[in-house]
A protein has these predicted regions:
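Short, Lys/Arg-enriched N-terminal segments with co-localized hydrophobic residues
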Residues: 1-5
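Gram-negative bacterial Sec-dependent N-terminal signal peptides
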Residues: 7-34, 537, 541
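Extracellular beta-strand/loop-rich repeat segments of large surface/secreted proteins
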Residues: 284-298, 319-322, 346-351, 358-469
Length: 552
């Protein structure tokens, strides 16, 4: 028998696969497991074409090898190099499943996949069992859109979900990639939120999301635009900006919630990347970090209300809220190569769990407008270098429960720890003491003896302690117990307690200065001798017994 041609091989594999699927071949193991086929969307004409139309598919990009059927859940779909009339792939059923989805080289506005009328009155799902990949083609444009397109309806609506195992944008090239020197654009837009017929939309990635990494040395844009009600990345969002380019995720629906398992910068060469609301649209969105226990992710980039603008924003109502819900650690250092200019933080940062660190000292003073809510987790100021003092600025803050971190014990020993600054009012809500956690990044407790810090005697008067170190500043206080021990100095140990410290005790005080507000300071003393501890316990027992007798 002569050698089978590629076209004949594809046809043969399809026949075998369909025979196995539909019972034409009953004996298990008669044929080996077949690799998935690559299907190219090559419709006969422009406009909107249904997924189920066999003639819209080929086994090669040129369309010279027509497919025998539409793709199945084992097959990879390619939608590439469309620069002429707009082509739209309509999902022709409420549930569509494929292996991978690859797009590349499409001009702006020329390529999209849409949910159509089959989605109406359904919870429609487009499931990709592998990855969605936005590759860099040979030209300057790599654009693609996911959307909805519906014919006349009578009050019908739909909920839509796109779900994939992974997502990559601007990580690899296609067909040799771009070989020139001009600015290239790789933009993937999920636009369901713009359709009123779609009442709820979700974009879910069960693994990691990767932006950038192709290695282009000149100007380039890599953008994921999310206009959905809810986005979820169960893995980690990994971003880098290639060459002198920029990479970003733009939240583009008001009220959008974006849950992610961590945010990580993957290259330090040139940093111009971030997550923010689409500029000048007046949007509010929320990032919810779900970092798993034991993880510690670092990101240096522009996490702000509307990203970078070189001129004042036309709409100043944008807010990016951040919630830390995971048991792990997330660190964000607000940064952009060159200048942050009008980048602003005005949302609410809520720390419910785990550890969350923020450094935003590079923002202009007038753009530090965020609020902090400490509600069970641990928060700390942060500098990406980790050898220099970091600053976390907030307009207001509320401490309910949880703790603040003094993680860099070397900086603390030098009395220059990273500093939390509240430019207006810091409030205490509730009776629970706020922990001041000295545990370092490796989970090791702080031992002052390792840094040759002299300790005051246990029970020493605050005026006798000479190792006071400032860890927080607030212009005004509300709800704290201010027991004055001398002029302008208040005992703060009723509201704060040390943790993650050994062979020493931490005591706290507020120092009030008319010009600078209130400074929270930590002093270190020796631990009490065992006999002193016993005496303290005995005194407490006697006091309790006396109180009970008086109550009878």
């Amino acid at each position: 028998m002569g050698q089978m041609k590629m076209k004949d091989k594809n046809i043969f594999f399809k026949i075998v696969k369909k025979s196995i699927l539909f019972g034409g071949i009953a004996a298990a193991g008669t044929f080996p497991v077949l690799a998935q086929s690559n299907y190219y969307f090559t419709p006969e004409s422009s406009g909107q074409t249904k997924f189920s139309v066999t003639s819209a598919w080929s086994y090669d990009e040129a369309g010279s090898q027509p497919a025998m059927s539409a793709p199945s859940e084992w097959d990879s779909v390619y939608f590439v190099n469309n620069s002429g009339e707009k082509k739209t792939l309509e999902l022709s059923s409420a549930e569509t499943k494929i292996k991978e989805f690859i797009v590349a080289g499409n001009s702006i506005g020329k390529a999209e996949v849409v949910f159509g009328n089959a989605a109406l009155d359904n919870n429609a799902v487009f499931e990709i069992d592998g990855k969605i990949k936005g590759l860099i083609g040979t030209g300057l444009g790599n654009y693609f859109t996911m959307d909805g397109s519906f014919w006349t309806t009578t009050g019908q609506t739909t909920n839509v979900t796109v779900r994939a195992k992974g997502f990559e944008l601007g990580v690899e090239g296609y067909g040799g990639g771009y070989q020139g020197t001009d600015t290239i654009h790789t933009v993937f837009t999920v636009a369901f939120g713009s359709r009123s017929i779609i009442t709820h939309s979700e974009f879910i990635i069960d693994g990691d999301v990767k932006l950038g990494g192709y290695g282009y040395k000149n100007q380039s844009e890599t953008s994921l635009v999310l206009n959905v009600d809810r986005a979820v990345v169960n893995g980690v969002v990994k971003i880098q900006s290639d060459g002198m380019g920029w990479s970003n995720i733009k939240n583009s629906k008001d009220g959008m919630v974006f849950e992610l398992g961590g945010l990580q910068l993957t290259d330090e060469t040139h940093v111009d990347c971030g997550i923010y609301n689409n500029p000048n649209m007046g949007l509010t969105s929320t990032l919810v970090f779900k970092n798993a226990k034991g993880t510690d992710y670092k990101f240096r980039g522009n996490v702000s209300d509307f990203g970078y603008l070189s001129t004042p924003p036309a709409n100043t109502n944008s807010k990016l809220n951040i919630v830390m819900d995971g048991e792990g650690t997330q660190r964000i250092y607000t940064y952009r190569a060159n200048d942050l200019a009008y980048s602003t933080q005005s949302g609410t940062f809520t720390v419910n769990n785990g550890k969350f660190y923020l450094g935003n000292g590079l923002l202009r003073e007038e753009n530090r407008k965020a609020s902090l809510v400490l509600n069970g987790g641990i928060f700390g100021a942060y500098n990406y270098s980790e050898t220099e003092q970091g600053f976390a600025y907030f307009k207001t803050a509320t401490f309910k429960s949880g703790g603040i971190s003094v993680e860099n014990t070397q900086l603390f020993a030098a009395q220059t720890p990273s500093l939390i600054v509240v430019t207006e009012k810091l409030s205490k809500d509730g009776t629970e003491k706020i922990k001041v956690d000295f545990t370092n990044a490796n989970g090791v407790a702080f031992n002052p003896g390792d840094f040759e810090i002299s300790l005051a005697e246990y029970g020493a008067d605050y005026s006798e302690i000479d190792n006071w170190t400032e860890i927080l500043v607030a212009a005004d206080l509300d709800g704290f117990t201010l027991n004055e021990i001398s002029e302008g100095i208040y005992d703060a140990s009723g509201d704060f307690e040390g943790s993650g410290i050994e062979n020493a005790m931490a005591v706290f005080r507020w120092v009030n200065d008319a010009a600078n507000g209130y400074s929270l300071q930590v002093g270190l003393t020796q631990v009490p001798e065992p006999s002193a501890v016993a005496a303290i316990v005995a005194a407490a027992v006697l006091a309790f017994a006396f109180a009970r007798r008086r109550a009878k």
